[in-house]
From Swiss-Prot:
One of its GO terms (cellular component) is cytoplasm. Coiled coil: none annotated. DNA repair protein that may operate in a postreplication repair or a cell cycle checkpoint function. May be implicated in interstrand DNA cross-link repair and in the maintenance of normal chromosome stability. Upon IFNG induction, may facilitate STAT1 activation by recruiting STAT1 to IFNGR1. PANTHER family: FANCONI ANEMIA GROUP C PROTEIN, FANCONI ANEMIA GROUP C PROTEIN FANCC. This is Fanconi anemia group C protein homolog. InterPro entries: FANCC (IPR000686). Its main location: nucleus. It comes from Mus musculus. The keyword DNA damage applies. Ubiquitous.
Length: 591
C-alpha cells in the first residue's frame, strides 16, 4: 500500500506537469497530445480514486499535497471532461477531498472551493448519473439547476456561426477561416458522443466551404463514423450522406460493417438482410451516384472473391431493391440518369431491369422478359465483336435485379405452350453460366429445353413421383451434350414442386425424407471471368440420396425457400407459401 501510494504521488507530479503544459497552449499539437494520453490519465485517476476513498481529507492532502491542483486543472480541460468515464472519476476524487465535518476556516474554505469545481463540472456538461443528484443536493440545489446551459449556448453559438459562414459563401470577411474549421473539428473529436454536441456535429458535416481541400480533420470524420456505426449517436440522412461523401474511408468502413452483419450467418434470410441494409443508411446514401459506385465496387469484389456465393448475390439484389425504392421516395423523377449508376451496362438495359418485375400482372410477363433477354444478348454478342464493354459487366448488371430470374422460371414452368421460348432459355443459361461462349451457351439451351419438356410432360401424364423427377432430370447415358448448370436444375425442380398442385403432393418426400436429388456441376462462378475455364465440366446427375445430407445443397434449398417467401407475393399461390414456410422450418431444424 505504501509503495503504491509513493508511486501514485510520483505519477501525480508527472501528470500535474502534463496538465500544466496542456493548459498553457491550445495548439493543434497540444490537442493531439491530450487525446493521445487521455486513456493513461483515466487509468491514473482510477487508481488514485481507489486509494483516496480509503483515506480522510487530511490524510489525502498530507500524502498527495498537489492532488487539488491536478483535479482543478482536469476540471477546466474540456477534452478530459468530454469522456463520461473521466467526468465520473474526477467527481468521485473531488468528493473524497471534501471534509465531512470541517472544524477550521481552512477546511471550510477547501470545501467551498471543491463545491465551486463541482458546480463548474456539473453546469458545463450534461450527466445522467445518480451521483449528480447526490452532489447537487449536497450543494443545496436541485439537479435541474445544473442543466447544461453553458455547453448548449456554446454549441448554438458555433452552429449559428457556421450557418452564417455557409450562407455568406464567397464573402471571405464573413466566412469562417479554414484553419479555424480544422481546429474546431479536431476539438470535437472526443466530444462527438455527447448529446448536446449533436447540432454542432451535424453543422460541421453539412458545412460546404469553397476551399479546394477538405477543411475538416480526418480524425473528426473517423470519430463520427465510429460513433454512428456503434449507434452511440443518431444523425439525419443528410449528415450521413455528407460524411460518407466527404470521407471515403468512412464509407468503406460502413460498407464492411454492413457486410459483417449480412454474412455473419450461414443461413440466408432475405428479410433479415433487408432489415440490416435499411438500418445501415447505405441505400439512402447511395442515391448519390458517387457513393453507390463505391458500394457497388465493394459488392463486385466480394462477389468475385467468393465465387459468386449465393448469400452475396442475395445481398446485392436486396440492396439494389432498397436503392430503387429510396430513389423513388427521394424523387419521382430520377435526379440522375440510371446510366450514372450503371455506366458499364447499356442504358436501355438498366432502364428495363429497374422496373419491379413482381408488379407486372401474371398475363403480361413474357414480353418484358423477352425484351430484357434480347437486350442482354445483343450486349453480350456485341462484346464478342470487339465492343469495349466486357460480357461480365452485362451479367453483373443483370444479377442486381434477381426478380427477373424468378419470373423467367415461373414463366417456363407455368405456361401452357408446348415449346419454351428461346429467349427465356437464353436468359437462365446466361444467369447461371455467364462464362460460357455462344456455342456452349446454345448447347446448354438445348439441354435445358429437353429438361423442361420432360418436366412438363410429367405434369400432364398423371400422378407425379420423386422417382419420375429423378429420371426426368437425368441426361441419357452417353449423351455428349454438356449438362445444364446443377444450380439451375435444382431451382427448376424445387420450383416445380412448390408452384404446381402435382408437386405439392410429393414435395415433403422429395425434399426431406424420400429419394431426392443431389446434382453436381458448376454453379454461378464469377471467378471464371478471370481464370482458365476447365475444358470438361462434370455431368449433372441425380442420385437416390437425401438432399438434406449434403450441407451445401441443403443451404442452397433453404436459401431458395427463403427467397420464395420473400418474393412470392405475385409469383405463388398461398398454398405454395405455406409449403415453403413449413419446409423451411423443417430444414432449418436440421442444420
Amino acid at each position: 500500500m505504501a509503495q503504491e501510494s509513493a508511486d501514485l504521488a510520483s505519477d501525480c507530479q508527472s501528470w500535474l506537469q502534463k496538465l500544466s503544459a496542456w493548459e498553457q497552449a491550445s495548439s493543434e499539437e497540444t490537442q493531439k497530445d491530450t487525446c493521445l494520453h487521455l486513456s493513461g490519465f483515466q487509468e491514473f485517476l482510477r487508481q488514485m480514486y481507489e486509494i483516496l476513498k480509503e483515506m480522510d481529507s487530511d490524510a489525502i492532502l498530507e500524502r498527495f499535497p498537489t492532488i487539488g491542483q491536478l483535479l482543478a486543472k482536469a476540471c477546466w480541460n474540456p477534452l478530459i471532461l468530454a469522456y463520461d468515464e473521466s467526468q465520473k472519476i474526477v467527481i468521485w476524487c473531488l468528493c473524497c477531498l471534501m471534509n465531512k465535518e470541517p472544524r477550521t476556516s481552512a477546511e471550510s474554505g477547501l470545501n467551498s472551493w471543491i463545491r465551486g469545481l463541482l458546480s463548474h463540472v456539473l453546469s458545463a456538461f450534461r450527466f445522467d448519473m445518480k451521483e449528480v443528484c447526490l452532489f447537487t443536493k449536497s450543494l443545496g440545489y436541485e439537479s435541474i439547476d445544473y442543466y447544461p446551459s453553458l455547453l448548449k449556448n456554446m454549441v448554438l453559438s458555433l452552429v449559428s456561426e457556421l450557418r452564417e459562414s455557409h450562407l455568406n459563401g464567397l464573402s471571405t470577411q464573413s466566412r469562417m477561416a479554414p484553419e479555424r474549421m480544422m481546429s474546431l473539428s479536431e476539438v470535437c473529436v472526443p466530444l462527438v458522443t455527447l448529446p448536446d454536441m449533436e447540432p454542432l456535429v451535424e453543422a460541421l458535416l453539412t458545412y460546404h466551404g469553397h476551399e479546394p481541400q477538405e477543411v475538416l480533420a480526418p480524425e473528426f470524420f473517423e470519430a463520427v463514423n465510429e460513433a454512428f456505426l456503434s449507434e452511440k449517436i443518431v444523425l439525419p440522412t443528410s449528415s450521413v450522406v455528407s460524411l460518407w461523401f466527404r470521407h471515403l474511408p468512412s464509407l468503406e468502413k460502413a460498407t464492411l460493417h454492413l457486410f459483417e452483419k449480412l454474412f455473419s450467418s450461414k443461413i440466408i434470410c432475405l428479410r433479415r438482410m433487408e432489415c440490416c441494409i435499411r438500418e445501415s443508411f447505405l441505400p439512402q446514401a447511395a442515391c448519390q451516384p458517387a457513393i453507390f459506385r463505391i458500394v457497388d465496387e465493394m459488392f463486385r469484389f466480394v462477389l468475385l472473391e467468393t465465387d459468386g456465393a449465393p448469400e452475396v448475390l442475395a445481398a446485392l439484389q436486396v440492396f439494389t431493391s432498397c436503392l430503387v425504392e429510396a430513389l423513388k421516395k427521394e424523387n419521382k423523377q430520377l435526379t440522375f440518369a440510371l446510366r450514372t449508376y450503371f455506366p458499364y451496362g447499356a442504358p436501355c438495359l438498366a432502364a428495363a431491369l429497374s422496373q419491379h418485375p413482381e408488379a407486372i400482372p401474371q398475363g403480361h410477363r413474357l414480353q418484358p422478359l423477352l425484351h430484357i433477354s434480347q437486350l442482354l444478348r445483343e450486349a453480350v454478342e456485341d462484346c464478342t465483336r470487339g465492343s469495349p464493354r466486357n460480357p461480365f459487366e452485362s451479367w453483373f448488371l443483370f444479377v442486381h435485379f434477381g426478380g427477373w430470374v424468378d419470373l423467367a422460371v415461373a414463366e417456363l414452368l407455368l405456361r401452357e405452350e408446348a415449346e419454351p421460348p428461346a429467349g427465356l432459355l437464353w436468359l437462365l443459361v446466361f444467369y447461371y453460366s455467364p462464362q460460357d461462349g455462344s456455342q456452349q451457351r446454345e448447347q446448354s439451351m438445348v439441354e435445358l429445353k429437353v429438361l423442361i419438356n420432360r418436366l412438363l410432360m410429367l405434369l400432364r401424364s398423371g400422378p407425379l413421383s420423386a422417382t419420375d423427377l429423378q429420371e426426368a432430370a437425368e441426361s441419357p447415358s452417353g449423351d455428349p451434350r454438356p449438362p445444364v448448370c446443377g444450380q439451375l436444375v435444382r431451382r427448376l425442380l424445387l420450383s416445380l414442386l412448390l408452384w404446381t398442385p402435382e408437386g405439392h403432393a410429393i414435395v415433403w418426400e422429395a425434399v426431406t425424407h424420400g429419394p431426392t436429388f443431389e446434382i453436381t456441376g458448376p454453379g454461378c462462378c464469377p471467378r471464371i471471368w478471370r481464370s482458365t475455364r476447365p475444358q470438361h465440366r462434370p455431368r449433372a446427375h441425380l442420385c437416390c440420396t437425401e438432399m438434406a445430407h449434403t450441407d451445401a445443397v441443403i443451404h442452397e434449398i433453404i436459401g431458395f425457400l427463403d427467397q420464395t417467401l420473400y418474393r412470392s407475393q405475385h409469383l405463388c399461390v398461398e398454398a405454395s407459401r405455406k409449403l415453403a414456410r413449413d419446409l423451411l422450418k423443417e430444414l432449418q431444424a436440421q442444420v
